[in-house]
């Protein structure tokens, strides 16, 4: 009886934990993640090389890195990770990391144009949405321009 080789996994929602990415997150995060992960070491950042090593150890071949937009800009506790942070990881490790562009329904058409730019010029393959961070159901009209743009671009939206 022969055994098949292991099937490599794809992490479909992976955060980017570089020092640069963590600098964009709010101050409450360390307390929030305490006890859930190795917060003392991970909250200082994980290099992309270390992230790839951890992925290899877990049998993960590829990861979808998302650039979260969590809550309206300027509200306490909210944060937006610039697409450029994820784009640099995609450029450095093509074929290992793929990008998902976070959506903020309150950005309107400027957000739609930023999504299009991320897909057409930064190598992103889809969009990511946290509906609960915006207190809007996924079928709210504020999302329609983003949905239409994703259809036009032929990319999926991941809702979490």
Where would I find each of the regions flagged by the language model?
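An N-terminally biased module of ancient metal coordination in phosphate/nucleic-acid-related enzymes
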Residues: 1-68, 73-77
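Active-site gating/metal-coordination segments in enzymes
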Residues: 61-62, 69-160
């Amino acid at each position: 009886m022969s055994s098949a080789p292991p099937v490599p996994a794809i992490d479909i929602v992976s955060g980017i934990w570089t020092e640069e990415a963590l600098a964009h997150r709010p101050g409450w995060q360390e307390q929030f993640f305490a006890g859930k992960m190795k917060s003392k070491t991970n909250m200082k950042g994980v290099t992309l090389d270390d992230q790839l090593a951890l992925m290899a150890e877990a049998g993960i071949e590829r990861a979808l890195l998302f650039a979260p937009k969590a809550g309206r800009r300027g509200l306490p506790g909210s944060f937006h990770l610039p697409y450029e942070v994820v784009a640099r990881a995609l450029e450095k490790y093509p074929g290992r990391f793929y990008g998902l562009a976070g959506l903020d329904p309150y950005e309107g058409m400027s957000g739609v144009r930023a999504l299009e730019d991320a897909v057409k010029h930064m190598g992103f393959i889809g969009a990511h949405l946290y509906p609960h961070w915006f207190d809007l159901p996924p079928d709210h009209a504020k999302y329609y321009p983003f949905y239409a743009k994703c259809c036009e671009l032929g990319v999926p939206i991941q809702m979490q």
